[in-house]
Amino acid sequence: MINPAGDAKNVGRKLVEGFERGVTLQFSEEIQKGLTDKYGHRVVLTRSPGEAVLPLQNASYANRSKADFFLSLHVYRQEEPKPKVIVYHLLYNPMVDLAQNNFNSFTFVPIHQAHFQNISRTVGFANNVKSVLNNGEFKKKLDFYGPYGLPFKPLVGIVAPSIAIEVGICEDNNWKHLVEPIVEGLNFLENL
């Protein structure tokens, strides 16, 4: 499942000519196509153009549909021509979040603890993205940062392994060069 930043009511950050909402939707559609072609998975976007998204709607959608993986995409404007890729995962307190937990499928889990169930898989997936994007081939095309564990609102309440990728670009079409590296960085999906 891919969550492009923004919606009908929230245009997101200002880019060179447009806004984050439109660029992330296009970016998400290309990544969706790349993942489907390369790994044969059914990839769902959390919103369509013109749709307004309520708080925690994406978390509810991902949990009800039992998504195998959740990716939140974000784009911001930067001055440097070399794109930056930053990976985040949800983490409130490393001592508590990363501790071993036993889960009963019949127990209510609060939204701020939903990520506990798959935190080790999430961290592993984020580190996989790091190892692929720090590869010599892709290192020339982009600067990679992370993965960083922090409270990140788009990932709150999601049980499935989930990461966010934020991309810094200097021109609105620079994201097109990043589709291949990101699809390659998500190569762990072929084993899901």
Residue ranges of each PLM-predicted region?
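Active-site-adjacent mobile loop/cap segments within catalytic or ligand-binding domains
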Residues: 18-21, 72, 76, 134-192
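Active-site microenvironments of hydrolase-like enzyme catalytic domains
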Residues: 3-15, 52-119, 148-164
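Sec-exported extracytoplasmic/periplasmic mature domains
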Residues: 29-40, 63-67, 75, 130, ...
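Soluble non-cytosolic domains of exported or imported proteins
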Residues: 18-26, 52-56, 116-124, 172-180
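Active-site histidine-acidic residue metal-binding/catalytic motifs
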Residues: 1-61
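Catalytic cores of nucleophile-dependent amide-cleaving enzymes
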Residues: 114-136
